Amino acid sequence: MTAAFTVVIPARYGSSRFPGKPLKTIAGKPMVQLVWEQACKSSAERVVIATDDARIVEACQAFGAEVLLTRDDHNSGTDRLAEVAAQLGLAADAIVVNVQGDEPMIPPAVIDQVASNLAAHPEAGMSTLAEPIDDVAALFNPNIVKVATDINGLALTFSRAPLPWARDALAANRDQLPAGVPYRRHIGIYAYRAGFLHDFVSWGPCWLENTESLEQLRALWNGVRIHVADALEAPPGGVDTPEDLERVRRLLEG
């Protein structure tokens, strides 16, 4: 049985890499609507879109979503979730799932999975998902975040760089994946308890988070354990660039 949880979808208009991304149309709908529709197919008790832009609020209201206008000075999507959890009055032990607003093809099953994993691992403050990397180009792509875990499935670290660096194998050949190294791609979906979100904001960003532009590093920096499991279904990949948008359009529009 899936644990009770609320989905929050952070959606920023002013992305430095791809401004206006949540409202880009795919199959005749704004991308954020597709994300919301996938989240609504999960077992979530509630699905809320959180944004700092009135244009996104208007678009979300037009397709019937619950949407909250948040401050525009948050350092990360998780900071925005903390404000939403406070606005919603969620109990400290309530589970909140962060579904990125640029994942229009996120499988509902993985939304349920990440919530259930957090409920099953009280030693972890967060849970997230990953999948194997089987392409050397993905290993060197900074838009694909790599994760390494310990024997208990808890994250050691995340990086945009190849992780781990197979010194001898990559010195000899960078055109193929080193044999025997279980490289994994991080999937940008998280579950937290609402009380943790308050702590996350109180810590503020750390230098490692700022350097990599990876908010989950703030949790590791402060000693929080992050449970990582391989996804039950592999998402086809999110939309980070205009090229990604065209790829997703081809998949969904035929």
UniProtKB/Swiss-Prot annotation:
Residue pairs linked by disulfide bridges in the UniProt entry: none
Localization, UniProt: Cytoplasm
Superkingdom of this protein's organism: Bacteria
Annotated GO CC locations: cytosol
CDD domains reported for this sequence: CMP-KDO-Synthetase (cd02517)
Catalytic activity: 3-deoxy-alpha-D-manno-oct-2-ulosonate + CTP = CMP-3-deoxy-beta-D-manno-octulosonate + diphosphate
GO biological process entries: CMP-keto-3-deoxy-D-manno-octulosonic acid biosynthetic process; lipopolysaccharide biosynthetic process
InterPro entries reported in the protein's UniProt record: Cytidylyl_trans, KdsB, Nucleotide-diphossugar_trans
Keywords per UniProt: Cytoplasm, Lipopolysaccharide biosynthesis, Nucleotidyltransferase, Transferase
The EC number(s) this enzyme carries: 2.7.7.38
Record flagged with keyword tRNA processing: no
Pathway annotation: Nucleotide-sugar biosynthesis; CMP-3-deoxy-D-manno-octulosonate biosynthesis; CMP-3-deoxy-D-manno-octulosonate from 3-deoxy-D-manno-octulosonate and CTP: step 1/1; Bacterial outer membrane biogenesis; lipopolysaccharide biosynthesis
Annotated Pfam families: CTP_transf_3
GO molecular function: 3-deoxy-manno-octulosonate cytidylyltransferase activity
Function, as annotated: Activates KDO (a required 8-carbon sugar) for incorporation into bacterial lipopolysaccharide in Gram-negative bacteria.
Family designation: Belongs to the KdsB family.
Name under which the protein is recorded: 3-deoxy-manno-octulosonate cytidylyltransferase
UniProt organism field: Pseudomonas syringae pv. syringae (strain B728a)
